[in-house]
């Protein structure tokens, strides 16, 4: 035993304590650390010592004698002849107690590992349940939203129904009011009543009707009664032989006077006629003949023109009133000698007044001017006095138009008098004109549709006709497109193929596909095998080979396999309807047979043989080849060099269709749609019932999660149990039962086994759990047997306590060495008080709080302060955990108040544990002392949130040993090294250690203003106080004569640059071979030359001079950037910009960057500027840009100048433009502006293909000279006003005046040059303002629209519509750079017209050599990339001389070797498709830098072999 330590004066100070790695595996109770240290010194570098350290448990007999156990085998390390000897031993010289202790420790470690595995499995299950809860919650929310939408629709329909009912009633009322006696229905009723009244009157008053005697004989006479019925008051015929007047009078005299009877009989006879005359009267022969003669005479007089024209007029008339007027006017027109064909058209489409005026003129009484004037006056009076649906202005306009048409018609009449149209020509012309009129009226008609929600949509039928014609033309020219070389897009069939593998004859692999109820592949893939292994979407199964299908005149066969039951959902291919030369696509797997890839190209089909230019590889045999419709065309069997050889199977399966019992993708989609629609139509009650079921299931899942969390916590708490019935308490010898026999006993019940299977445990994991449980049960059983008759229980308990404490320390150290990620995934039990807070919502907040021993109460108090009782809203989660030596508290779903947590991010507090044994009369007492020390800066940073109490406050007076330890130098903490490989996050760029660090991406807005800096801003640093530095000196140094000198400010800045940058790191590279470029140097002439761009030309007032083109360009810009509408002005403190840039004048006098200024003074000046009313003018600071330029420009001092303002003004502009700029950056693939675009990962190819589609085959490249400086102020301010228009009304109302002031400062600048001159510039877009590129894009967009509208006007005489312009013109623009494609039929582009237009209208400079026309994108350039298409994809070729010049004459020094390596890799990426010599040169330099880095021990990232190709 070691002594208690020195206590008296002159005692030797204790030696610094250093914990040895591997101490956890030792079980010797005394002097472990010193023995291990001496053992390492003696054997640390030998192989025997390394193998000993690989054992599970190590026992130190002495420095030269060690035992170890691994599994069930013991090993011994001794010294033989001065050398360590490590060997296995079957019977080690150990006591049973020592063996039991080593076995117990080994078992405890095994149980600890299994517990960790079980804990991880449970936590994974918890995460899955949480995901399921989240999915159900989302589904519940979607269902509720759907119900709300249905309710809104039902309410809208109800309201619409009510509106329609009210409208119907109103229409009925109006209809009743309009029904008058002059209506057609009333007129018919009136005629009916008149007819009835006439009949009744005639019946009452009688008539002059009488009989007519027919000159025919009759054998009998009629009596008086018969005569009276036939002849009195009736028109009838009576045979002359049957009439006897005297006998009739005598018979009548019986009733009345004889003379009266004779008179009545005489009056009843009207006359006498022959039999032929009777027939003519009965059949109305005379009337019919007269009618026929009249018609014939009319036809002969008027020909057939009049009736035909009248007939068509009546057909085309709009109502009955118009029909009557038209018929009358036609008759008058015929009488007046007017031509009936034009008169018919006038009657049909012109007002009736126009036709009447033409008839009046035809009478010959009024001249043309007079009738025209009267016609116009009449129509105007009608427009004013007679109400109509149209506006009065529209009606007056119509009156004027038809008044102009009237003399034109009359003149046409007069001209037609000199010609004669035959009857047949009139008929044909009339029919054609009427038919065309009907068709035109139908096409131009407007259709109104009322939606169920009440919205009304209108469209014209002519648009549908255009769409139909476009569809027909698309189908008609589809084959032509293929011939022209345009590769079509193919449907994705990535899920339709499977991987087939066989083990016969060394094994082979290929691709299979489903056709009907079988899977097919190439015959040589399966060979003679009977069983094949099929893999689809990670699912693997066995399938029988049913046979081979012989292919006619082909060397290979087509193998047919059955479909395994798990693969019933494998999509089915559909056969192509025809096979002909066209573009095809082959679907297969990559070289590793992991990911699906495709090959596309032109296929030549010769009979059943198919050849395509696919450079395939082993493993692609059996791949399906599809046509442009996604239908199965053929099968790939192999390749010859770069030509794929396949077989067309359309005719093979034509007689025996393969698709019999399966459903196609379209049928399945239709069925799914029908099911979805059926589910939508269920009633509200059913939806409510479903919601209740989902809520119950959600609650049940939440309960399961809570139970699992509790189980997890209980499992972790069990690690602290200190009982002899555990692994840590086992130290006794075994009894008479066989361990092998016990391990065969049953541990899990059937219910427990099934529950583990349902929870996702595999058979191997269940077996490990069972083995661990059995091991635990076996040890417990041994403990129970040894407890009987055991008297020395106190010493055993003390020994158990010591072993348990040692194991706890080892477990705690191992858990702490797992890294930061472990605390975020598990709630770990600690011996000291520890808090962990995580809240995920709009932003992620994580905090860890650690307390030394003795401060558990304070930990609980802080926990109660941070965790509130408020529940988090939906979509946010939080977890809080408190770990104490005797309990664990966990809370989830509550809002956490982080203001009680004070973070110290620059300090690391480590814990070192020291155990001292003090010898006292009352016995041995184990004391623990924990000190909190500050770790070195190179150690990883751990967040510490509550200041740690001083250790002196927790020490007790009766512990002098601990106080002495406190005064010694702090021991260096032993930490487990992180052995994982370094990785770089692709999202945020942060480097972390794999498998050790739990990486959380940082926010991409890394340039947010820092907090702090509350020192008041002195007046001499404010942006609007620059005038105090200006002296009234008229000293002209570089400013041209036509610009004023406002004063002079004395500043100490570089004016001329004559030396180039010297970078020592570049000395280790070979000098590149490049010429024509260099880094910039300049003299004072460069400042003078920078003013030339403002004086190239003056713009005209294009708004007044070209109003139509201006309106067209405005409409085009609005259509393109309409996504900016509804943006907001953000607070200035939320803006983001580069804070390491110059703070401009006057802040640059005291600070090198904006960051320094903000750290000192904060953002109060920024906020005051945004909230106040501004009327002053900021000062703009100018300096020349150091970059790589052409040697000619450098020699001519043609250097670009940067103009920037105070960062307060810059951030003010950012508050106005940030949201709009972000929206533009998000739409580079679908819109013109390319701010934030990338050419990599196919980005350049997608954009070039987009702009050259839809017939836009002509490519135009245009580059302005001095674009920023020559932009007209009127145009620039117009774009700024357009951006203001896109803001919300609230933002415009609140910040409108401030925005107007800011916009004015952009083009009216007080400018300070490095020479100290202060001048006034009133033109151009300053290159240092926040939105320079975005504003240039808008100007570019506007000018392009104006340019093509101008060209179209020159070619066709009209300005195109915005729709036609956008359909025929598409382009990419980045600032002043533009690549455009247009349809050649749209404009016949003339470069000289464009040059003259920009110079004469806008005062802008376009050089003739900067306008280039191409028939294809090849050779054109955009953003420094010259477009080429080497492998079917558009890539960019750069100017390697300019890029490599940065390695020869750099513009700035590189900070370290890693930066040089990164620059070389970046240059190789850019030059990959350019000069091969440049790529080879860069590869050699990269290799040289990597060799140097390895020699210096510098770790560089690894770049794969295909990195440079795949990134494009």
From Swiss-Prot:
It catalyses: RNA(n) + a ribonucleoside 5'-triphosphate = RNA(n+1) + diphosphate. Residues 940-981 are annotated as: Disordered. Keywords: ATP-binding, Covalent protein-RNA linkage, Host membrane, Hydrolase, Membrane, Nucleotide-binding, Nucleotidyltransferase, Phosphoprotein, Protease, RNA-directed RNA polymerase, Serine protease, Transferase, Transmembrane, Transmembrane helix, Viral RNA replication. It comes from the Viruses. The modification O-(5'-phospho-RNA)-tyrosine is found at residue 753. One of its GO terms (biological process) is proteolysis. Its EC number is 3.4.21.-, 2.7.7.48. The record marks 204-205, 478-479, 717-718, 730-731, 809-810, 954-955 as: Cleavage. This is Non-structural polyprotein 1AB. It comes from Avian nephritis virus 1 (ANV-1). The lineage of its organism: Viruses, Riboviria, Orthornavirae, Pisuviricota, Stelpaviricetes.
């Amino acid at each position: 035993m070691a002594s208690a330590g020195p206590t008296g004066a002159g005692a030797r100070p204790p030696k610094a304590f250093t914990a040895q790695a591997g101490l956890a595996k030792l079980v010797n109770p005394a002097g472990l650390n010193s023995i291990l240290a001496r053992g390492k010194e003696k054997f640390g570098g030998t192989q025997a010592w390394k193998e000993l350290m690989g054992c599970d448990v190590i026992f130190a007999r002495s420095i030269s004698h060690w035992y170890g156990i691994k599994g069930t085998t013991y090993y011994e390390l001794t010294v033989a002849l001065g050398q360590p000897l490590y060997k296995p031993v079957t019977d080690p010289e150990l006591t049973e107690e020592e063996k039991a202790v080593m076995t117990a420790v080994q078992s405890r470690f095994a149980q600890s590992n299994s517990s960790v595995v079980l804990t991880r499995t449970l936590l994974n299950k918890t995460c899955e349940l949480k995901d399921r809860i989240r999915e159900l919650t989302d589904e519940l929310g979607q269902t509720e939203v759907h119900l709300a939408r249905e309710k809104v629709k039902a309410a809208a329909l109800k309201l619409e129904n009510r509106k329609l009912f009210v409208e119907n009633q109103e229409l009925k009322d109006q209809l009743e009011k309009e029904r008058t006696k002059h209506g057609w229905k009333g007129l018919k009723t009136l005629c009916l009543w008149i007819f009835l009244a006439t009949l009744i009157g005639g019946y009452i008053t009688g008539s002059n009707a009488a009989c007519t005697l027919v000159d025919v004989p009759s054998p009998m006479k009629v009596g008086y009664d018969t005569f009276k019925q036939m002849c009195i008051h009736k028109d009838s015929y009576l045979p002359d032989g049957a009439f006897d007047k005297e006998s009739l009078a005598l018979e009548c005299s019986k009733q009345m006077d004889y003379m009266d009877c004779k008179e009545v009989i005489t009056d009843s006879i009207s006359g006498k006629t022959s039999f032929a005359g009777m027939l003519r009267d009965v059949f109305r022969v005379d009337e019919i003949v007269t009618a026929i003669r009249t018609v014939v005479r009319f036809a002969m007089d008027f020909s057939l023109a009049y009736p035909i024209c009248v007939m068509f007029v009546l057909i085309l008339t709009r109502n009955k009133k118009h029909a009557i007027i038209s018929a009358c006017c036609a008759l008058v027109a015929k009488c007046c000698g007017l031509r009936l064909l034009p008169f018919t058209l006038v009657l049909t489409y012109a007002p009736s007044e126009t036709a009447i005026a033409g008839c009046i003129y035809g009478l010959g009484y009024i001249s043309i001017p007079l009738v025209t004037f009267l016609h116009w006056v009449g129509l105007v009076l009608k427009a004013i006095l007679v109400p109509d649906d149209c506006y009065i202005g529209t009606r007056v306009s119509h009156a004027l138009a038809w008044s102009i048409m009237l003399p034109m018609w009359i003149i046409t009449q007069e001209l037609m008098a000199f010609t004669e149209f035959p009857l047949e020509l009139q008929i044909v012309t009339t029919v054609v004109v009427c038919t065309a009129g009907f068709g035109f009226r139908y096409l131009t008609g407007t259709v109104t549709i009322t939606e169920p929600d009440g919205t009304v949509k209108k469209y014209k039928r002519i648009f549908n006709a255009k769409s139909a014609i476009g569809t027909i033309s698309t189908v008609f020219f589809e084959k032509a497109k293929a011939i022209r070389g345009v590769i079509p897009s193919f449907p994705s069939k990535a899920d339709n193929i499977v991987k087939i593998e066989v083990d016969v004859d060394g094994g082979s692999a290929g691709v299979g596909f489903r056709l009907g109820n079988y899977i097919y592949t190439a015959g040589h893939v399966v060979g003679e095998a009977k069983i094949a292994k099929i893999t689809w979407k990670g699912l693997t199964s066995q399938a029988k080979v049913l046979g081979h299908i012989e292919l006619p005149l082909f060397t290979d066969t087509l193998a047919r396999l059955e479909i395994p039951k798990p693969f019933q959902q494998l999509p089915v291919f559909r056969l192509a309807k025809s096979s002909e030369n066209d573009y095809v696509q082959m679907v297969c797997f990559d070289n590793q047979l992991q990911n699906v890839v495709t090959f596309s190209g032109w296929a030549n089909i010769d009979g059943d043989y198919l050849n395509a230019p696919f450079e395939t590889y082993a493993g692609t045999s059996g791949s399906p080849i599809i046509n442009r419709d996604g239908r199965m065309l053929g099968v790939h069997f192999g390749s010859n060099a770069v030509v794929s050889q396949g077989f067309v199977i359309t005719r093979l399966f034509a007689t025996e269709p393969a698709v019999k019992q399966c459903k196609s993708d379209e049928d399945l989609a239709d069925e799914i749609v029908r099911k979805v629609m059926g589910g939508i139509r269920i009633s509200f009650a059913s939806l409510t019932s479903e919601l209740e079921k989902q809520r119950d299931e959600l609650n049940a899942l939440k309960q399961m999660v809570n139970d699992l969390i509790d189980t997890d916590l209980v499992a972790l708490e069990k690690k602290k149990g200190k009982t002899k019935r555990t692994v840590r308490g086992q130290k006794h010898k075994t009894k008479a039962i066989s361990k092998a026999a016990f391990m065969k006993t049953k541990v899990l019940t059937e219910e427990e086994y099934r529950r583990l299977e349902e929870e996702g445990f595999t058979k191997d994991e269940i077996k490990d759990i069972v083995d661990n449980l059995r091991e635990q049960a076996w040890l417990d059983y041994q403990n129970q047997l040894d407890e009987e008759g055991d008297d020395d229980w106190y010493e055993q308990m003390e020994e158990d306590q010591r072993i348990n404490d040692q194991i706890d320390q080892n477990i705690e150290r191992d858990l702490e060495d797992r890294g930061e990620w472990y605390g975020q995934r598990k709630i770990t039990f600690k011996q000291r008080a520890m808090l962990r807070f995580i809240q995920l919502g709009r932003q992620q907040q994580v905090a860890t709080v650690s307390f030394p021993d003795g401060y558990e109460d304070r930990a609980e108090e802080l926990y109660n302060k941070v965790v509130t009782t408020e529940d988090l809203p939906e979509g946010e989660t939080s977890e809080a955990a408190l770990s104490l030596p005797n309990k664990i508290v966990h809370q989830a779903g509550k809002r956490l108040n982080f203001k009680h947590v004070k973070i110290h991010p620059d300090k690391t507090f480590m814990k070192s544990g020291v155990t001292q044994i003090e010898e006292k009369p009352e016995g041995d007492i184990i004391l623990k002392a924990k000190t909190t020390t500050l770790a070195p800066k190179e150690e990883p940073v751990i967040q510490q949130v509550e200041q740690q109490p001083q250790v002196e406050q927790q020490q007790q007076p009766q512990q002098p040993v601990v106080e002495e330890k406190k005064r010694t130098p702090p021991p260096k903490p032993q930490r487990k090294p992180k052995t994982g490989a370094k990785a770089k996050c692709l999202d945020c760029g942060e480097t972390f250690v794999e498998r050790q660090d739990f990486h959380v991406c940082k926010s991409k807005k890394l340039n947010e203003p820092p907090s702090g800096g509350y020192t008041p801003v002195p007046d001499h640093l404010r942006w609007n106080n620059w005038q105090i530095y200006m002296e009234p000196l008229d000293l002209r140094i570089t400013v041209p004569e036509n610009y004023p000198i406002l004063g002079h400010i004395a500043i100490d800045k570089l004016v001329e640059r004559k030396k180039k940058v010297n970078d020592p790191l570049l000395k280790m590279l070979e000098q590149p071979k490049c010429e024509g470029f260099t880094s910039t140097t300049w003299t004072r002439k460069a400042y003078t030359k920078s003013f030339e761009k403002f004086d190239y030309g003056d713009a005209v007032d294009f708004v007044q001079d070209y109003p139509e083109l201006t309106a067209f360009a405005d409409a085009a810009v609005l259509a393109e950037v309409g996504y900016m509408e509804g943006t907001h002005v953000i607070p200035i403190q939320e803006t983001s910009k580069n804070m390491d840039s110059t703070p401009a004048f006057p802040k640059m006098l005291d600070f090198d960057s904006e960051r320094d200024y903000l750290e000192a003074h904060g953002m109060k000046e920024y906020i005051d500027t945004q909230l106040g009313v501004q009327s002053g003018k900021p000062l703009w600071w100018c300096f020349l840009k150091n970059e790589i330029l052409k040697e000619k420009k450098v020699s001519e001092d043609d250097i670009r100048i940067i103009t920037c303002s105070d960062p307060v003004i810059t951030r003010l502009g950012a508050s106005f433009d940030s949201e709009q700029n972000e929206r533009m950056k998000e739409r580079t693939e679908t819109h013109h502006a390319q701010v934030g675009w990338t050419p990599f990962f196919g980005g350049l190819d997608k954009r070039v293909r987009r702009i050259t589609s839809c017939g836009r085959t002509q490519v135009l490249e245009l580059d302005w000279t001095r674009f920023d400086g020559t932009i007209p102020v009127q145009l620039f301010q117009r774009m700024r006003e357009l951006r203001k228009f896109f803001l919300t009304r609230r933002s415009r109302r609140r910040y409108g005046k401030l925005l107007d002031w800011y916009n004015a400062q952009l083009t009216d600048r007080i400018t300070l040059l490095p020479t100290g001159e202060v001048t006034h510039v009133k033109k151009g877009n300053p290159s240092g303002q926040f939105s320079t590129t975005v504003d240039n894009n808008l100007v570019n967009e506007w000018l392009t629209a104006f340019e093509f509208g101008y060209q179209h006007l020159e070619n066709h005489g009209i300005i195109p519509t915005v729709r036609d312009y956008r359909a025929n013109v598409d382009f990419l623009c980045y600032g002043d750079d533009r690549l455009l494609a247009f349809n050649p039929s749209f404009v016949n582009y003339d470069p000289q017209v464009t040059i003259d237009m920009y110079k004469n209208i806008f005062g802008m400079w376009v050089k003739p050599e900067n306008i280039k026309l191409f028939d294809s994108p090849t050779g054109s350039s955009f953003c420094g990339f010259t477009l080429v298409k080497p492998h079917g994809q558009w890539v960019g070729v750069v100017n390697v001389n300019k890029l490599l010049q940065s390695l020869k004459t750099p513009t700035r020094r590189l900070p370290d070797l890693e930066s040089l390596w990164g620059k070389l890799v970046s240059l190789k990426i850019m030059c990959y498709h350019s000069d091969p010599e440049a790529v080879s040169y860069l590869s050699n330099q990269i290799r040289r830098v990597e060799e140097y880095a390895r020699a210096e021990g510098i770790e560089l990232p690894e770049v794969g072999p295909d990195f440079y190709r795949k990134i494009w």
